[in-house]
């Protein structure tokens, strides 16, 4: 159980992870998934309940305590150091040093290359992180987890900003970690991820534990019902809303280095979608429209 002022973020929940298992954690926004991860990684301390690893009770006062118990997390929003190299990001905090205290760069670059190649990825370890794609940055973070000998890896919405091809690459790496005996908590809103990778799935709703199922024994409709608390016959029912005149018109919107020649119009009563991968400029366009970016 975890409480914040005026909010119960976790209410007596339970979660069990087996060795070499991919266990999906699902629920709507606000269900308590992120709070549980922060408790497991030592960011928050629970008010009630216990955490056990291999049957032994542990108490995490901070993230170092969690890491010392072979737990690593890979978050949806990258936590890398963008202007440091791949090698520096992998080994930051546990660099190889000479007796004089100098960093053994050649040894670390070689080890980083070895880690990346073990995951089937040919990334130059001397490359700055800012020059990598989102998918490549996640692979570097997975390499960092492997380098720390993590036996429990938490992946928080790892496919949210990835293309179909990049998702397939992440699936391959995740399955490889599982085959090596690593236990993985996989958080995702995407049913495809869960049915493709997970052995079991646990659902939280309104900060409470709802249930745990073998993935091959729960249907998509049953899973959605567990998440929302009711039978869902239609996820997005169409409503007859008259579409009116143009409410917003954008023509040739340009901001050097961010976006170029963006044009569209939005009509009254219309839901207008603006989509693209991370870095495509979606947020910047909206900031430009709102006057936050000139």
Model regions: which residues?
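Glycine-rich phosphate-binding loops of nucleotide-dependent enzymes
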Residues: 1-294
């Amino acid at each position: 159980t975890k409480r914040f002022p005026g909010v119960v973020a976790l209410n007596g929940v339970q979660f069990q992870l087996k060795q070499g298992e991919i266990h999906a954690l699902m629920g709507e926004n606000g269900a308590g998934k992120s709070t549980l991860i922060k408790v497991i990684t030592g960011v928050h301390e629970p008010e009630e309940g216990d955490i056990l690893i291999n049957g032994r009770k542990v108490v995490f006062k901070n993230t170092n305590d969690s890491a010392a118990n072979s737990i690593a997390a890979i978050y949806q929003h990258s936590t890398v150091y963008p202007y440091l190299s791949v090698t520096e990001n992998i080994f930051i905090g546990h660099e190889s040093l000479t007796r004089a205290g100098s960093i053994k760069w050649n040894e670390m670059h070689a080890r980083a290359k070895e880690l990346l190649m073990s995951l089937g990825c040919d990334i130059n370890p001397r490359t700055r992180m800012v020059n990598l794609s989102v998918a490549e940055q996640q692979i570097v973070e997975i390499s960092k987890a492997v380098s720390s000998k993590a036996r429990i890896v938490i992946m928080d919405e790892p496919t949210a900003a990835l293309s179909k091809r990049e998702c397939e690459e992440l699936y391959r790496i995740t399955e490889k970690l599982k085959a090596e005996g690593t236990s993985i908590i996989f958080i995702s809103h995407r049913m495809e991820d869960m049915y493709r990778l997970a052995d079991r799935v646990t659902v939280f709703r309104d900060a409470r534990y709802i249930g745990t199922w073998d993935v091959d024994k729960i249907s998509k409709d049953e899973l959605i019902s567990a998440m929302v608390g009711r039978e869902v016959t239609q996820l997005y029912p169409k409503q007859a809303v008259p579409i009116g005149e143009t409410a917003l018109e954008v023509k040739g919107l340009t901001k050097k280095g961010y976006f170029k020649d963006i044009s569209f119009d939005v009509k009254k009563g219309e839901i207008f979608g603006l989509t693209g991968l991370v870095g495509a400029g979606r947020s910047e366009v909206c900031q430009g429209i709102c006057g936050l970016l000139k």
